[in-house]
């Protein structure tokens, strides 16, 4: 299935609460595990992802480091001014290993807001975001009256080995800094 968060598929970060020119929010959408957006040391932090059009979303995946609590909200309108919660989750502390969160959802969205509510450390990173789904067919998702749609969480997985960490390894080898030894998420994203 198509990953609608990728830049080449129309995904665009239209707002980020913080930015470092060395680690811009666009890094989350480039398809690479060793590039990332980094927070500036305070929480909460958030970013809004605009999809090319309003689509049915079936899976949201994040690859991050040092995120303790994450919430995702959706908006299916042309103007991103009213969001509804999709899910909120607490992530395990994986040390210098990346956190992979996979959530099966059944929603319709044009915008997704990712809110990093708390971190395990002073800084946190989001290395990749994936939004999988299909064209908006006008129905069959978003439970009536629920606002949340439906969601099923798959267990969080850590990944990493020797090497640096994205939150502490800014001067490390860029090919090794984020994933503690490389990628390996091609099947997931």
UniProtKB/Swiss-Prot annotation:
Residues 167-177 have a biased composition (Low complexity). Phosphorylated. Ca(2+) binds at residues 27, 30, 32, 35, 127. One of its GO terms (molecular function) is metal ion binding. InterPro entries: Galactose-bd-like_sf, IFT25. GO terms for cellular component: cytoplasm; cytoskeleton; intraciliary transport particle B; motile cilium. Residues 135-189 are annotated as: Disordered. One of its GO terms (biological process) is intraciliary transport. Transmembrane segments: none annotated. Changing residue 30 to A: Does not affect interaction with IFT27. Keywords: Calcium, Cell projection, Cilium, Cytoplasm, Cytoskeleton, Flagellum, Metal-binding. Residues 178-189 have a biased composition (Gly residues). Changing residue 35 to A: Does not affect interaction with IFT27. It is found in: Cell projection, Cilium, Flagellum; Cytoplasm, Cytoskeleton, Flagellum basal body. Component of the IFT complex B, the core composed of IFT25, IFT27, IFT46, IFT52, IFT74, IFT81 and IFT88 as well as associated subunits IFT20, IFT57, IFT80 and IFT172. Interacts with IFT27; the interaction is direct. Component of the intraflagellar transport (IFT) complex B. Forms a subcomplex within the IFT complex B with IFT27. Belongs to the IFT25 family. This is Intraflagellar transport protein 25.
């Amino acid at each position: 299935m198509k990953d609608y968060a990728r830049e080449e598929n129309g995904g665009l970060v239209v707002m980020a609460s913080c930015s470092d020119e060395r680690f811009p929010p666009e890094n989350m959408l480039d398809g690479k595990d060793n590039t990332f957006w980094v927070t500036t040391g305070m929480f909460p932090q958030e970013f809004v992802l605009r999809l090319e059009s309003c689509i049915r979303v079936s899976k949201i995946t994040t690859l991050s480091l040092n995120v303790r609590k994450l919430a995702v909200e959706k908006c299916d309108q042309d103007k991103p001014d009213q969001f509804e919660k999709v899910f909120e989750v607490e992530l395990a502390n994986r040390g210098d290993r990346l956190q992979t969160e996979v959530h099966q959802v059944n929603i319709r969205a044009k915008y997704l807001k990712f809110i990093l509510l708390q971190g395990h450390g002073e800084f946190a990173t989001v290395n990749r975001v994936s939004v999988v789904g299909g064209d908006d067919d006008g129905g069959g998702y978003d439970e009536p009256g629920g606002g949340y749609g439906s969601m099923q969480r798959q267990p969080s997985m850590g990944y990493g080995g020797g090497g640096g960490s994205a939150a502490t390894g800014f001067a490390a080898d860029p090919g090794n800094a984020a994933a503690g030894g490389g990628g390996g998420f091609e099947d997931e994203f």
